[in-house]
Amino acid sequence: MANFPASLLILNGKSADNQPLREAITLLRDEGIQIHVRVTWEKGDAQRYVDEARRLGVETVIAGGGDGTINEVSTALIQIRDGVAPALGLLPLGTANDFATSAGIPEALDKALKLAIAGNAMEIDMARVNDKTCFINMATGGFGTRITTETPEKLKAALGGVSYLIHGLMRMDTLTPDRCEICGENFHWQGDALVIGIGNGRQAGGGQQLCPTALINDGLLQLRIFTGEELLPALFSTLTQSDDNPNIIDGASAWFDIHAPHEITFNLDGEPLSGQEFHIEVLPGALRCRLPPDCPLLR
């Protein structure tokens, strides 16, 4: 692999002491691969390191962390307007790793790192909310948002993605649906939503396939709404993905407008955004990402 250009790894600070990762990087450096490593400490670090990556002339910026880290790095990359932006590499090190998992990124660190450096760079879409905040994987509202936002860090560290489900079951008595109106291309719905998923990617909340047919290079966003008054049946519908469930509404559009009479919160790759009006649009071919040849998210 000695002929591959240099890469810069932006590593979430929580993984800075990951010994297997240190060993994998050392082995690749011994093979002649140039890998710069930078560790994030606070919000804004990813943007600064992407700027540094441009100055260093690297061809790949690797996001080492969970969906939030991938979001920060990819958002910084699409801000580059002059010249060709570095490609995005994925190194899944978070609690759930929803985007990387659905994209088929290997779980083994050494294999994921090699793919992030040497994999084919494919153009993929991103999405933008209210002309400002971006997401690469999914925007979730309702039950899913409240659970992923409120699940304690210690529970996530101990149990991983299943912690979201456990915390959700514990909070059943306090969760109510959100009344809203959602419009898109040839789509209109109004009612009470228990769960809303608007996906560029397919899964969120620790492995739940909210938008199972989503693709990241088709110029569309997939929508799935779980309706109804009773939360427990909707939760089990989320887990079983019943195709004939009358409480599941699906749609696809390059954009969606959402209006609610009260404030609701969407979770954008782990980042909460609250309001009553949301305009969500796809950004076709917004960045290049190094993905496996059999990536299930590509058409």
Curated annotation (Swiss-Prot):
Domain DAGKc: 2-133
A single GO BP: phospholipid biosynthetic process
GO molecular function: ATP binding; lipid kinase activity; magnesium ion binding
Residues annotated for Mg(2+) binding in this entry: 215, 218, 220
Keyword Nucleotide-binding tagged: yes
Keyword hit for Transmembrane helix: no
Cofactor note: Binds 1 Mg(2+) ion per subunit. Ca(2+) may be able to substitute.
Subcellular location(s) per record: Cytoplasm
Primary subcellular site in the record, as a coarse category: cytoplasm
This protein's GO CC annotations: cytoplasm; plasma membrane
Homology family: Belongs to the diacylglycerol/lipid kinase family. YegS lipid kinase subfamily.
Name this protein carries in UniProt: Probable lipid kinase YegS
Provenance organism: Salmonella paratyphi B (strain ATCC BAA-1250 / SPB7)
